[in-house]
From Swiss-Prot:
Keyword Disulfide bond attached: no
Signal peptide: none
Function: Component of the cytosolic iron-sulfur (Fe/S) protein assembly machinery. Required for maturation of extramitochondrial Fe/S proteins.
Binding site for [4Fe-4S] cluster 1: 23, 68, 71, 74
Key words, A-Z: 4Fe-4S, Iron, Iron-sulfur, Metal-binding
Binding residue positions for [4Fe-4S] cluster 2: 187, 243, 395, 399
Source organism (scientific name): Drosophila mojavensis
GO MF annotation list: 4 iron, 4 sulfur cluster binding; metal ion binding
Family assignment from sequence similarity: Belongs to the NARF family.
Name of the protein in question: Probable cytosolic Fe-S cluster assembly factor GI11683
Length: 476
């Protein structure tokens, strides 16, 4: 089995910007002086030797996540980069070590293992194993508990909080400067692209609200740790996500807690990696006893653990914020089902609200880098179509078609598979973020809404990455 997910490699997929072939991080290789020259042999498995009078195994070059985040040589995520701490192998190693510590009675070093599962991987795995989504969640929970999980959580509470924070942020920005477009922040592929390619020009437009993954990180490492009476560093937090970019997001310095001396999310695995782990064991989800997911946030759990947020597949930001802004800013009620108008392609759509003959709200959804690039060019030229808010996602069709979702198994076209996943999503119950659970988190943990604590824990900042000119960037 490969050291990392088989899909994590350079691709030439349409509408996907692959990383630069050159990494700008210089790596020093000690060379031996020779009058006759040396021969370097590279084996298929990556083992390579330098031979002259004998053989010398060369040092394996590893690029860490921090190198990748500080680099400006790539456009999107970690494709083609060896990510040593964000793989299924690293996860299984940690779980085995934890079980060994339990068996030896060394309780002081045992960690609490917490898994958080996003809705898109659940839908992908449900389709792969021909299960209902809630049923798949319970079987996956059973599988993860067998691996060593102490808690298995859904992202529902964080999805709700992200919408509440983002809508409030939009209303405040609109009142301060209605001409400044606000762009969503939950997609790390898009954020990475913005930081490295457009820098200080575009960063003021991006919402500061953290993604649901990172909000879950705060809740697990602080709120759950507090309830368990342990330090956040004693919790090993794993998330199951639909794309590899989430691995980079979890490794940002912004999401390292000095209070806990640990990252809010320790490890990210993806839908396809879960499938590979099951394939390695020659198992299916159905073979694991179902187990209820945990709900440690309030005394009374919700009716279900897997929820949809609006009708779009990437968190429902554009829809939810549009409805809230129309009501909050203009006292206008909108239909439950909004009708976004597709423009040049199905991955770019818009909706607007008119009042007294004037467009007062104009929202858009832009999925895929082709549409993102077009949007950026219009903003830079000052010829933007006047959008007040744009939900931006790097993947065509959004998170439901994330780059690490389970692949088609029968020669099925990706578009057809995506449509089937969308149908499963539409069958889920709709979450209303204004609920007793989020209110409890605000009052019991965040000292209320719009407080210094909520601002500190639920928001983040961005950093332009300076383009470096090195010899490795030169193309001969």
């Amino acid at each position: 089995m490969s050291r990392f997910s088989g899909a994590l490699q350079l691709t030439d997929l349409d509408d996907f910007i692959t990383p630069s072939q050159e990494c700008i991080k210089p790596v020093t290789i000690d060379k031996t002086k020779s009058k006759t020259g040396s021969k370097i042999t590279v084996q298929a498995d990556g083992y390579y030797e330098e031979s002259e009078s004998g053989k010398q195994k060369l040092q394996k070059v590893e690029i860490t996540l921090q190198d990748c985040l500080a680099c400006s040589g790539c456009i999107t995520s970690a494709e083609g980069v060896l990510i040593t701490q964000q793989s299924q192998e690293e996860l299984l190693k940690v779980l085995r070590e934890n079980e060994r510590l339990k068996a030896s009675g060394d309780s002081d070093k045992v960690r609490t293992i917490v898994f958080t599962i996003a809705v898109q991987p659940l839908i992908s795995l449900a389709h792969r194993f021909e299960l209902g989504v809630e049923e798949a969640a319970r079987h996956l929970s059973g599988y993860l508990r067998q691996l060593g999980a102490d808690y298995v959580l859904s992202t529902k509470i964080a999805d709700d909080l992200a919408l509440l924070e983002c809508r409030q942020e939009f209303v405040e920005r609109y009142r301060d400067n209605a001409d400044l477009s606000m762009l969503s922040s939950s997609c790390p592929g898009w954020v990475c692209y913005a930081e490295k390619t457009h820098g200080n020009f575009i960063l003021p437009h991006i919402a500061t609200t953290r993604s649901p993954q990172q909000i879950m990180g705060v809740l697990v490492k602080q709120r759950l740790a507090e309830k368990l009476g342990v330090s956040g560093s004693r919790i090993y937090h794993v998330t199951v996500m639909p794309c590899y970019d989430k691995k980079l997001e979890a490794s940002r310095e912004d999401f390292y807690s000095e209070v806990n001396s640990s990252r809010d999310v320790d490890c990210v695995i993806t839908s396809i990696e879960v499938e590979q782990m099951l394939q390695t064991e020659e198992q299916t989800l159905q073979q694991f006893a179902p187990s209820d997911m945990d709900w440690p946030w309030t005394d009374q759990p919700p009716e279900a653990m897997v929820w949809a947020h609006e009708s779009t597949m990437s968190g429902g930001y554009a829809e939810h914020i549009y409805k809230y802004a129309a009501r909050e800013l203009f006292n206008e009620e909108t239909p439950n089902e909004l009708q976004f108008k597709a423009l040049r392609n199905r991955d770019f759509s818009e909706i607007s609200l008119e009042k007294d003959g004037k467009i007062v709200l104009k929202f858009a959804i832009a999925n895929g880098f082709r549409n993102i690039q077009n949007l950026m060019q219009k903003l830079k030229r000052g010829k933007g179509p006047g959008y007040h808010f744009v939900e931006v996602m790097a993947c065509p069709s959004g998170c439901i078609n994330g780059g690490a979702q389970v692949r088609p198994t029968t020669g099925q076209h990706v578009r057809e598979l995506t449509q089937q996943l969308e149908e499963l999503y539409k069958q889920l119950p709709r979450s209303n973020p204004d609920n007793a659970h989020t209110k409890h988190i605000y009052t019991d943990f965040l000292d209320g809404t719009q407080t210094d604590k909520s601002q500190s824990l639920l928001h983040t900042s961005y950093h332009a990455v300076e383009k470096l000119n090195t010899a490795l960037n030169i193309k001969w």
